[in-house]
């Protein structure tokens, strides 16, 4: 495998047209849960099945891109055995954008911390900009108080050890996350890891902020539908319960995806909307939304047309909504696919969803346009695909 000479947080296209993926190193001591993390996140392995995973004996590269194993950034995830060292890794640390270091929350921390410090020291000279993400893993094993206490202790010890080694290492960016394959904390943590690799993140966040303020939405996420990682969210804080709710809803809808696909394949049913969507700013709809209803929206935006002018097959964008009563009275969870691989999940006041449906849909079309424009700019700039 040919490796680039310089660190890069962006995938580039090599001369032969193949995409250089963003490299992420998955490190940690034996049995800390590295392979489980990779398998649960990207191969949909049920968490309980991780029990049967074989130990990793040599460095294994897993490729994820927009076509097959979809993720928003073409990734190359290096799953390493527990005994790997900087010298035996087989690639310079300058090749990696991010190191995800996994620590079993119930472990004796001495050994994992020494290994982490070894890699921080190894990376410092060659790639000081590398992101170190420490996953304090298997968190669900402990009670809430113990979990927080262990999390704090690990952070403290790592910081102390780094300061003992050299004051310079304090400059290395280290981020700590509590994770478990048994809940959505892993997806949330890995989403945050990816956010640092998305150049256009602030523009996407800006679009989501506008969507939220126009529709009175308290929270909106843009999810990658395959990996179930969120690409961006609006600027209000993420609370775990809302994130979990959105992940579960997305997972449930994805299980119905084959039904939508077969519809999408039947072209004559697709109606093109007018090329410029007309905003219905005061649109009110008296038709109440049925709870837990899934409704197909067939739309074709101007950017669906290739620039050559040749009519491309219209895309199918399903949408769905579910009332969150009684747990969240007066709130509706909505889902809108905005590109073939990205979906908007938003909480909306039920009154807005039911009474101002036109306004909501216009804002979805507007968001879709914005995301496609960003995608086009990204594509032109780096001639590579971050979003599909
Ligand atoms: N309770 C709990 N167990 C987990 C979690 N993640 C992984 N495990 C378990 O941890 C054990 C080791 O998982 P692996 O993914 O094989 O760990 P690894 O770090 O890849 O191991 P090596 O390849 O030997 O270095 C398995 O029995 C998993 O089921 C978690 O979040 N919670």
Predicted regions and their residues:
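Short, flexible boundary segments at extreme N-termini or domain junctions of P-loop NTPases and their
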Residues: 1-29, 62-66, 163-166, 179, ...
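Glycine-rich phosphate-binding P-loop
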Residues: 22-45
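Switch I (effector-binding) loop of TRAFAC-class P-loop GTPase G-domains
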Residues: 42-72, 84
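Conserved nucleotide-sensing/catalytic segment adjacent to the nucleotide-binding pocket
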Residues: 63-97
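Inter-motif core of Ras-like GTPase G domains
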Residues: 85-112, 116-127
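Canonical P-loop GTPase G-domain recognition
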Residues: 130-132, 140-219, 238-242, 248, ...
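A charged amphipathic helix-loop-strand protein-protein interaction module that recurs
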Residues: 204, 237-333
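Short hydrophobic/glycine-rich mini-motifs in sensory/regulatory modules
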Residues: 337-345
């Amino acid at each position: 495998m040919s490796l680039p000479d310089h660190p890069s947080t962006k995938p580039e296209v090599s001369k032969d047209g193949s995409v250089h993926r963003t490299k992420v190193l998955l490190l940690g001591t034996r049995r800390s849960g590295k392979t489980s993390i990779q398998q649960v996140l990207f191969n949909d392995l049920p968490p309980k099945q991780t029990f049967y995973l074989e130990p990793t004996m040599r460095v294994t590269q897993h490729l994820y891109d927009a076509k097959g194993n979809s993720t928003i950034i073409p990734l190359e995830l290096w799953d390493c055995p527990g005994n790997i060292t900087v010298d035996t890794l087989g690639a310079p640390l300058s090749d990696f954008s991010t190191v995800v270091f996994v620590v079993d929350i119930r472990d004796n921390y001495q050994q994992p911390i020494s290994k982490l410090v070894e890699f921080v020291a190894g990376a410092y000279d060659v790639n000081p900009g590398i992101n170190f993400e420490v996953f304090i893993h298997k968190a669900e094993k402990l009670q809430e108080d113990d979990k927080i206490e262990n999390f704090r202790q690990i952070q403290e010890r790592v910081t102390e050890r780094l300061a003992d080694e050299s004051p310079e290492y304090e400059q290395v960016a280290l981020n700590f996350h509590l994770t478990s394959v048994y809940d959505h904390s892993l997806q949330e943590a890995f989403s945050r890891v990816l956010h640092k690799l998305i150049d256009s993140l602030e523009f996407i966040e800006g679009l989501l902020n506008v969507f939220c303020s126009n529709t009175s939405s308290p929270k909106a996420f843009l999810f990658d539908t395959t990996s179930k990682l969120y690409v961006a969210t609006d600027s209000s804080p993420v609370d775990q319960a809302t994130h979990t709710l959105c992940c579960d809803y997305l997972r449930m809808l994805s299980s119905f995806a084959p039904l939508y696909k077969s519809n999408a394949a039947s072209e004559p049913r697709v109606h093109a909307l007018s090329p410029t969507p007309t905003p219905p700013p005061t649109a009110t709809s008296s038709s109440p939304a049925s709870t837990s209803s899934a409704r197909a929206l067939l739309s074709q935006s101007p950017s669906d047309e290739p620039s050559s002018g040749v009519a491309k097959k219209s895309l199918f964008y399903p949408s769905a909504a579910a009332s969150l009563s009684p747990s969240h009275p007066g709130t509706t969870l909505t889902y809108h696919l905005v590109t073939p691989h990205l979906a908007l999940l938003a909480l909306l006041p039920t009154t807005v969803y039911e009474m101002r449906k036109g306004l909501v849909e216009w804002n979805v079309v507007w968001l879709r346009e914005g995301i496609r424009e960003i995608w086009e700019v990204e594509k032109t700039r780096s001639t590579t695909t971050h979003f599909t």
